[in-house]
Amino acid sequence: MIEPVKRQLSSSGAQLPRSSGRGRTVARKLSDILTGHPGRAAVTMFALVITGFTALLRLPAVSATGESLSLVDAAVTATSAVTVTGLTSLGPDAFSLTGQVIILVAIQVGGLGIVTLGVWLTLLVSRRLSLRTRLLSSESLGVSKLGEVPALLLTVLIFTLSIEALLAAAMLPVFVTEHGPAKGAFHAVFYAVSAFSNAGFVLETNSFDHPVVLTTINIGAFAGALGFPVVYMLYRMVFHRAAMNLHTRLTLEVTVVLLVLGAGLVAAFEWQNPMTLGQLSPLEKVHEAIFASGMTRSGGFSTYEVMDQNDPTLVVTSVLMFIGGGSGSTAGGIKVTTLAVLLLAILAEIRGDEHIQVHHREISSSLVRVAVAVVTAGALLVLTAVVALTAVTDQGITVATFEALSAFGTVGLSTGLTASAPEAGQWILIVLMFVGRVGIITLAAGLAARSTPTFYRYPTERPIIG
């Protein structure tokens, strides 16, 4: 049972054992990052962690051949693991057990959230959470009330480890039967972490032949894509009889609609395709279609080659990848609540409503402005990346667009472009994965100069729209 922290941390902090001088030095440096601008702190921490894992993956012991990986291969793998994407330039057999363990740790760090782990480390060493740190945590986790941050941080940790343990236990008998106790246990843990984190990393190319593994991974990816704020809200509803907030309601509604709609479209377009669903039984087709629909919004696992799909399915998959999962989750994309706010704004405009209302709540115009900014900036970024990818590779616009959307949405479904692209193309995909995980608005805020308040306003005019 998830038991979040009951007490709010005071300004002086919870009393913990005193740390060593070296620990205080580390804490001070970490605190300097965490107490800066929230957006800049998140960007800095992600960049530092990715750099660290890139260095680790360049060690000779990581490679199955004993030779050091190239800088770009290590950077692609590290970025993909920390951003829980799944796009790689190397196959799963390119890594030794040491390399697989490092990738597993990187996925777990990225899935839990670098900011979350940084805040926990700060709390353990310095014994307090400053207001700035709470602001950073609230922005990273997608909560609006600073008082909920400590409880949510503990909920994130307990829920993540509990779900991953359950997923591993469900898959353990299958993998032990196939690989033996030790290797089977490692496979179960690896796929549990990869599924819940929506990372899409695999240890073997034929890992999803068993229906138990397929179903377990689908459930894990679905839970991970909901977002920690939703999980925390559901916990409070069950154990504290709290009322469901609007964010949770919209996230659940849009997630279910997209899952069902995506599965229906995949089944309709691929039902007779012998390369994907055509040779399966009707029940297996439905199961595979649901799995494919869930994986397109961040999971990144696939039971068949992406390019074997028909063109309409590629379009549907591309749209779902751009949307992504829930805010504060392991998923990327523009997020399902962003889509919901935009659709509600369009509906209100069509109806002529002065205010945007849903479920007896009103959505502010400032939130609509943020949603428009997220979608527009994301679309422009992907468009720019597609142009750049087509310029540096010999692939057409379909392949480049799919790969760019997969990187931006931190999905991991691949046409093979990540592995075949020249270094320039791979660095483009690295940037997309980084921005997709950090969030384009967070990145912009982190890179922007300190804002200067204005004490005046200009006259209002209305340009012609449409």
Predicted regions and their residues:
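Membrane-proximal intracellular helices of multi-pass ion channels
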Residues: 1-466
